[in-house]
């Protein structure tokens, strides 16, 4: 099974690109890591992130057993190296083919996308500041795609190469 991991700051387009890929590749499951850590109120600490990683790996393992599923797209903000390592180690144990991509964009693009997104409850000024501050960290990761001046289709094509 092929697993594509889309990482990056909030608002960069992980979900949009991930859903586009899933919609255009039959047999693809879409997982948003946020679903695996949906505690109210939100608590993003080591314990809850470890639980989310376990939930993600269980979901992918179940999709792997499903005859109609040939690929999984996982989107999640993974700003701590241990999270990515745990997921990739788990996928390696499943003998999955993994492609890990980090999406980034310019500060201006992130602000514009943030302001244009009226569907996400996280699109507050406070979270925008958190996301903007995280840009340099994501920009230093490997396998970067700068989505600033690209369409969803163009980003998806680059991810699938």
Summary of predicted features, one role per range:
Residues 6:
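Hydrophobic anchor at the beta1->P-loop junction of P-loop NTPases
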Residues 11:
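Walker A (P-loop) phosphate-binding loop of P-loop NTPases
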Residues 1-3:
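Pre-Walker A (Motif I) flank of P-loop NTPase domains
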Residues 116-158:
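Small-molecule kinase domains that catalyze NTP-dependent phosphoryl transfer to phosphate-bearing small molecules
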Residues 94-114:
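Conserved phosphate-donor/acceptor-positioning beta-strand/loop module used by diverse small-molecule
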Residues 18-61:
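Conserved substrate/cofactor phosphate-moiety recognition/catalytic segment
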Residues 51-94:
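Glycine-rich phosphate-binding loop used to anchor ATP phosphates in small-molecule kinases
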Residues 14:
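Conserved lysine of the Walker
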């Amino acid at each position: 099974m092929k697993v594509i991991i889309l990482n990056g700051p909030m608002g960069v387009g992980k979900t949009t690109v991930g859903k586009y890929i899933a919609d255009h590749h039959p047999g693809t499951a879409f997982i948003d890591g946020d679903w695996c850590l949906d505690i109210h109120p939100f608590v993003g600490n080591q314990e809850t992130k470890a639980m989310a990683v376990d939930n993600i790996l269980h979901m992918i393992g179940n999709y792997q057993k499903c005859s109609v599923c040939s690929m999984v797209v996982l989107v999640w903000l993974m700003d701590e190296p241990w999270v990515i390592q745990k997921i990739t180690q788990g996928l390696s144990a499943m003998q999955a083919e993994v492609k890990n991509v980090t999406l980034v964009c310019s500060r201006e693009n992130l602000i514009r996308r943030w302001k244009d997104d009226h569907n996400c409850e996280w699109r507050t000024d406070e979270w925008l500041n958190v996301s903007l501050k995280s840009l340099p960290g994501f920009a230093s990761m490997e396998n970067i795609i700068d989505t600033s001046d690209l369409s969803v289709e163009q980003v998806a094509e680059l991810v699938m190469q």
